[in-house]
Structures are given as C-alpha cells and as structure tokens.
Amino acid sequence: MSRRKQGNPQHLSQRELITPEADHVEATILEEDEGLEIEEPSSLGLMVGGPDPDLLTCGQCQMNFPLGDILVFIEHKKKQCGGLGPCYDKVLDKSSPPPSSRSELRRVSEPVEIGIQVTPDEDDHLLSPTKGICPKQENIAGPCRPAQLPSMAPIAASSSHPPTSVITSPLRALGVLPPCFPLPCCGARPISGDGTQGEGQMEAPFGCQCELSGKDEPSSYICTTCKQPFNSAWFLLQHAQNTHGFRIYLEPGPASTSLTPRLTIPPPLGPETVAQSPLMNFLGDSNPFNLLRMTGPILRDHPGFGEGRLPGTPPLFSPPPRHHLDPHRLSAEEMGLVAQHPSAFDRVMRLNPMAIDSPAMDFSRRLRELAGNSSTPPPVSPGRGNPMHRLLNPFQPSPKSPFLSTPPLPPMPAGTPPPQPPAKSKSCEFCGKTFKFQSNLIVHRRSHTGEKPYKCQLCDHACSQASKLKRHMKTHMHKAGSLAGRSDDGLSAASSPEPGTSELPGDLKAADGDFRHHESDPSLGPEPEDDEDEEEEEEELLLENESRPESSFSMDSELGRGRENGGGVPPGVAGAGAAAAALADEKALALGKVMEDAGLGALPQYGEKRGAFLKRAGDTGDAGAVGCGDAGAPGAVNGRGGAFAPGAEPFPALFPRKPAPLPSPGLGGPALHAAKRIKVEKDLELPPAALIPSENVYSQWLVGYAASRHFMKDPFLGFTDARQSPFATSSEHSSENGSLRFSTPPGDLLDGGLSGRSGTASGGSTPHLGGPGPGRPSSKEGRRSDTCEYCGKVFKNCSNLTVHRRSHTGERPYKCELCNYACAQSSKLTRHMKTHGQIGKEVYRCDICQMPFSVYSTLEKHMKKWHGEHLLTNDVKIEQAERS
C-alpha cells in the first residue's frame, strides 16, 4: 500500500487506515518527516502533514482507490484478488531490490510488535525498533459470524484460501478484534464491485455506541466497563490498556518516538469504575469485547505459530507483580530488552501500583511460594519463551519465577542499594499477622493448618513447637524416675526425680537426645510459648547462636564415643551409663584444664582433699564410700566441670555416679588412669545418665572461675557437708511466676545462694547445668507436687503452679463486677480495678453505660470499642446539624 500527495488533505478520522492483503495487514505510514500532530481531541489522534488525500493501491493489479472508498477496495480484494501481492513480498523478502519510490521505502520498513501473534516468517522483524505498526494478521475463510468467534484460528501465510480479512476500525488495526468482524457503529454495508452499497447491514454485539451521521468513522466510543466516552478509538485503546490493565499493544521504543503521536491523558474514570470493574468476569464467550481476553489463548494453541512463541494473556484485572520487573532480578537479555523498550517497561511498572501492596492479593503467591519447595507446576508453554514476552508477561510460571520458590537472590550490582523486602514477606497469609522472623511465622502458621510435626516417641502426643515437646518429655522423665531403684549411698536415687534428671530407659534417652539435637539446631529459630515473646526470644537465640563458639561436645560425637567406650557392658545392662562414663572422662580432661587456669590447682586445700579423695577411691573401690564424707570436696570445688560425686543430686543424670578426677600439678597420670579403671569397672551398677548439651561448656567455665574467686576469699572453707556447698542451690527462679530459670549469676550462687534443702547427704553437689530439667532438690522431703501435669514445668511453690495450671485449663476465677473482665490471678484483678477508679481521684463515667474510669484515655478506648456505632451516629447527626 502506498500513499500519494493529492489536492485536498482530509482528516484520517474520516476514513479507514488499513489495507488488508491476503494474510498480512499493514498499518498506514505517515508521509511527512516532521512527525504527527494532534489537532483536535475528537479525532483519532493522527494528522497527515501532506496536502493531498491518500489512495489505496492494490498490490496485485495496482488499481488506486480513494481512502474514503475503502469498502469498495475491500470488495475488490475479496472478489478479484487472491494470493499474495507484490507489496506483501516486499516486506518479507529481504533480498529484493531496494524500492524506487519514497512511499515504497516507508512501506518496506520493519514493523514493531504490538503484543499480537505473528507468523514464523515475520519473527525476524519484531524485536528491532522500527517506524511502523504491524497490526494483527488473521485469515478467515468466508464471512465471520459472532457465534464462530471463539473457534477462530489464524491461517498461515501460505494458505490457499481467498483472503477475507477485513479491518474496519482502529480496534482491528491494532489486532484486538478479529479482522472480519465489523462493528455495528461503523455502519459497514456490503459493497458491490461497482461501489454501490448493498441492502443488508452487518451487525454484531459490541459495546460501542457512536453517532454515525453519515461518517465512516464513529465520532465517539464508550467503554463497556466504566461507561467513559472517548472521541477516538486510539484514546479508547489507551484507556483500556492503562486503566483496566488490558494487554493490547506495546508502546514503541525511543528510536520511534519521533513518529509516535503525542497523546493526551485519558479522561479520568467515573466514581462507579471500581464497582463495575468485575463486569468482564461475567461476559459470555460470544461477546466480542471478551475477545480482548480470549485472543491470546486462542492463537497460542494454533500449530501454525509454533510453540511458546507468545505466552497466554493474563487475567483481566491481575496486575503484574512489581518484583518481576525489578532491574536487580532480570537476566542480561531481559535487561537489554528493557533498555530498548523503556516506555513499555515503565508502563507495566505503573499498572495498579496500590494493588500490589495489598495483603489480599498475596494469598496465592504465598501458597505457591510454600509449595514451590516441594513441587513446581509445569509451565504454560514448553520451552523458554521470547525474553520480551517473559518480561512483559510475567504471569506465566517458569523455574525462574519468584512465585514458585524462594531461592536467595543473586548478588546485587556494586553501588546499587538492594531493594527493601516487602513487609508482607513475613505476614501470615491466613490472618495477616506480621512477624519479624521467618521461624516465628512458620510456628504461627501451624495454628491455622493444624500441623504438628513434633511427635513423642513414647506416646501419641504431638505438638507444633519443639519447646512444647520438651516440656512433654519432662513428664515421661518424671514418671520414669519414679520406677528406678535405690543407689549405694543409702539414699533413694529417684525418690525425688527431677524431670530430665532421673534415670531414663534407653528409648526415652534416645527420644530426649534426638529432641536436644533438634533443639540445638540454630536454623530452626525460637519457638516461644507466647506470641508476645516470640520476637524477643528469637533475637536472643540468634545472638546466642552467633556468639557461641564451636564446641567439641556435639551430640553426635558424644553418642558415638559413648557407644564405642561402652561396648564391654553385658547385654542385660543398659549401656547408657557406660556411654556417660566415657563422656565424663573426656569432659574431665577438657574441663580440668579450665580449673587449672582458674587457679584452683595452686591451693593447698584443693590438693589435699583431692589426694585424700583419690586415695580412698583407689584403695577401696567402693562405690558407696566414694560418695560419702570428704569425697564431696573435689566435686564441689570443680563446679560444673570437675569430678562429680555420686551424690550430686541437682543433676545426677548429667554425669555418672563415679569420680572423674581432674589433673592437677600435684597429681600424676597413674592416679588418673586408676580412677578411670574404677569408673569402668563400676559401670555395671550405674543407672543411665543424660548428656550435657554443648551450649553449657561456657557456663561451666564461668562457675569454675567464680569458684576460684570464692576460694581465694575464704580458703579454709570445708565441704564435708553438702548442705553448705556453695554450689548446691537451686534458687534460680524468675520474678514472674516462680518457675526455675537459669538466670542467677555465679557470684550470687557463691555468696548468697546457700540452700539447706538443695543438697543431699553426699558431697559434691553441683549446680544444675540447664539440661532437660530444672535443678530441683533431690531429697525425699523436697519432692512435692509442684510439677505441672500438662507441660512438666517445675515451680518452687504450689501457688505459682496453681496459677500456671489455669493457663492450660482456661480457668479465670477472678471477675470484675463492673465489666466483663476476668483473669487467673487476683493481683491482675486488683490492678484492673484501679482503672475503674481510685480513692481521692476524679472518676470519668461513660455517658452510655455509666461505667467509671480513673483515666480519661481509658474511657475513650472504652467508647471506641463498645460504643463505636453509637459515636458514629452521633457524629453524623452533629455534622448534619452544623450544615443545616
């Protein structure tokens, strides 16, 4: 198609712009070099600079038609011309001789892609910026009816069918609607070969209302979604793409900006736009306007266009996620395409920016993100699509999509600040609650899904947090300890079994060991009991994991070494005691160095008592004698890492009831080996013992250092009575509910923490190491019902246990008489009553329910919470009164 200058210029909005030829429809190319101008808003937006009218030239017979007689030209093409014309060959044949005329030169210029389906032959011309527009190509044999629209498919360029494609409006020029589907507003009538109009009028249901008034091009268009009128189809297309999110065309790149019409901003939407936007979801398949959504999937499945050439069109009202077009996450080829098409990139980035940040839009993404670690849905089309298509159509699933997995992002370019992660990344997709750490979100999500991954190996109990499983395991330890026998020193070894410190069967020990190994994993994060403490405990745990040195006493190595050293135990006896004995030997070697560094080896009292202890242990070899009298001194001196006497009841399961002497300057190697031999020989009499967690090594050193300071202050302190041992204390308890905590510093343990009920008749009492159970007293009289039967938590007094038990039962016996407040502690009720008024202070009463409050801000909160609707009604009445 070519255009020539003629006598009188005519506005392009009065005539059609497109000449269809066989299987290719070319857009009209403007003649003048100075570009395009918009003279009036009622026009289509294009203005020809030349003074002559345009002509339509048939590519086969070279017959010229005035642009106003485009219908005659269409009939001419339908009845006489079939097959490809020379003008079409000039576009596709790169080896053809250069065109001789200026119009032919413009016609041969490569088209730019506008988001439509193309043939494989035209694929070479799509990605380079050009100066023309290549509209959609379709061929339908015979006239098209509305009922046939959903089943339409394009025909290849080599098809022998006679060309019947007709474009009668700018919507067809941009490939939005099927080319042979006429608009009712265009008044398309069948034209005979001589140029006379036919009798019938071709009509189709389309949401376009126009004023014909004898014009070929309608003067107004009305959007079916928001009922907004437009003066030209070009403005309507812009409105549909930029406002409603339809993906219709691509904006040209910077190389073609000189030929791009300067467009005005579309009129604003009406107030009913948002409410009517979901209308398109209910349009039938036969509605032509619905083809804006159906065109992509229809053409994509046709075999004539290859596989994966153009991904499917996204849903109508789903804007592309912003992070898909983040420059930091694009590959090199996609970044090059963004550089070539910045306007299209910016347009996609502008689509509905507020909808992206809405939490309601995040459910499907979060679910796909969670499921992406295990399974990935197959992509829509096989193979890797065109980079520009993947850039501008990020809705198609692909292995690189952030929707499907959460791999670490590639390193950011130097000097570029990384994009801030959205706040919703750690928000619950079920209730919207936000969390500072991912592990807290994982634990919280289980409350919605009902997942309970932590299961007890001894019963049917299952829970969602490792900490709850730990408390549950204490109940099993407590029960297992009550079945143990008596020890050789005459005291019951399990009469006061502490949770986690009593003798355990092999399977219970294995379960506890597995749990501890799981709990010590820093990648799991904290699992707090209350939601309010989740973030704080997470931060503390992270800091602890970062600052904690690597310990040689890992759980796996301890178990492995224990099994190797305990291989000589007969099958009828549990081997846990032998494993713990070998472990204690290694700990003695490692921690003995710590005690020497602390200065205890230089004290004469330390050396004398140690020598007497080793002498008696080597001479008698009696397990009972080892745990009596002065034998307790070395254990007491050693603190948390020395030779532990069998009577060390605050943590009897952490070390075996045999001496594990420490090396000192005055003691040689033979004595140490003798003690080891005695320990191994007496392992048959030892009950199973638990293992020390690796995180307690540092605390052991602290206690040893504090012990050295204490001995230097009072070097003549004797430890024949374990009841006066500075280490035999379990006074660590929190200020909230009296539950035992390991928060007391070592200095307090030494100076003021003496407890007469925390030791036993045997020496060597040592503080609890923070193992599976708190440091409870081990004597018979110390055994009280201060252990929670629900979670195994231990309390110093029964009143705290009573209050704690209500957190499990939900009981709230203390109720306020003025409101519906109820609590589990009387102190909380007393504190609450102060909010209703205090003696000698002014009282503020609610005007509606007459409830008293001592603080006015509390009254305001009460009004908003309980009388919000009433206040809103009063505000409306006050505003109406003020206006009147």
Swiss-Prot record:
It is found in: Nucleus. Changing residue 783 to C: In gamma induced thymic lymphomas. Gene3D superfamilies: Classic Zinc Finger. It comes from the Eukaryota. GO terms for biological process: alpha-beta T cell differentiation; apoptotic process; axonogenesis; central nervous system neuron differentiation; commitment of neuronal cell to specific neuron type in forebrain; epithelial cell morphogenesis; hematopoietic stem cell migration; keratinocyte development. Sumoylated with SUMO1. PROSITE patterns: ZINC_FINGER_C2H2_1 (PS00028), ZINC_FINGER_C2H2_2 (PS50157). The modification N6-acetyllysine is found at residue 841. Keywords: Acetylation, Isopeptide bond, Metal-binding, Methylation, Nucleus, Phosphoprotein, Repeat, Repressor, Transcription, Transcription regulation, Ubl conjugation, Zinc, Zinc-finger. This is B-cell lymphoma/leukemia 11B. It comes from Mus musculus (Mouse). The lineage of its organism: Eukaryota, Metazoa, Chordata, Craniata, Vertebrata. The gene is Bcl11b.
